[in-house]
């Protein structure tokens, strides 16, 4: 378990040091946007990797393989649409994220059942959970 915690700390440090990968010339034209696109231009300094240009997303920026894709709490992030899917989760290694298409009535049922089973729900605040549990 200590190895897992060490890798989670390493993942956090790597994330803090990782630059924001922005599209080439994103600042020149607002319609382009900042979302990452790999530069392919023949004379592109960014593609070549000149030091005074923005960073290019490469394999070296990836986090540790064992903790890649996990929630910062260390749990797997599982999308849940109903109570049946929630019951199938393992609370020790998995946490729930309620789908955006779920309505309020079913959301309340899911939060109550998750509290009963000891499953963490990532996208419901503590205040909302308390409010749902009191209903």
From Swiss-Prot:
Concerning InterPro entries, the annotation shows: Ribosomal_eL32 (IPR001515), Ribosomal_eL32_arc (IPR023654), Ribosomal_eL32_CS (IPR018263), Ribosomal_eL32_sf (IPR036351)
Query: What HAMAP family has UniProt attached to this entry?
Result: Ribosomal_eL32
Fetch the SMART domains from UniProt: Ribosomal_L32e
Q: Which GO terms describe its cellular component?
A: cytosolic large ribosomal subunit
Any one GO molecular function term = structural constituent of ribosome
One of the GO biological process terms? translation
Q: Which CDD domains match?
A: Ribosomal_L32_L32e (cd00513)
The record's NCBIfam families line, in alphabetical order, gives: PRK08562.1
Q: Is Ion transport tagged as a keyword?
A: no
Q: Which PROSITE patterns match?
A: RIBOSOMAL_L32E
Write down the species: Methanococcus maripaludis (strain C5 / ATCC BAA-1333)
Q: Provide the protein name.
A: Large ribosomal subunit protein eL32
Q: Which controlled-vocabulary keywords does the entry list?
A: Ribonucleoprotein, Ribosomal protein
**Highest taxon in the source lineage:** Archaea
Q: Which family does it belong to?
A: Belongs to the eukaryotic ribosomal protein eL32 family.
């Amino acid at each position: 378990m200590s190895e897992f915690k060490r890798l989670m700390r390493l993942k956090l440090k790597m994330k803090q040091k990782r630059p924001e990968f922005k599209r080439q010339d994103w600042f020149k034209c607002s319609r382009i946007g900042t979302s990452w696109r790999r530069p392919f231009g023949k004379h592109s300094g960014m593609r070549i990797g000149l030091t005074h240009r923005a960073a290019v997303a490469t394999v070296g920026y990836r986090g540790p393989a064992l903790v890649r894709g996990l929630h910062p709490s260390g749990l797997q992030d599982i999308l849940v649409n109903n109570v049946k899917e929630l019951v199938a989760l393992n609370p020790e290694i998995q946490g729930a994220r309620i789908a955006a298409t779920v309505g309020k009535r079913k959301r309340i049922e899911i939060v109550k059942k998750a509290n009963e089973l000891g499953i963490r729900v990532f996208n419901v605040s503590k205040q909302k959970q308390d409010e749902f549990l009191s209903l």
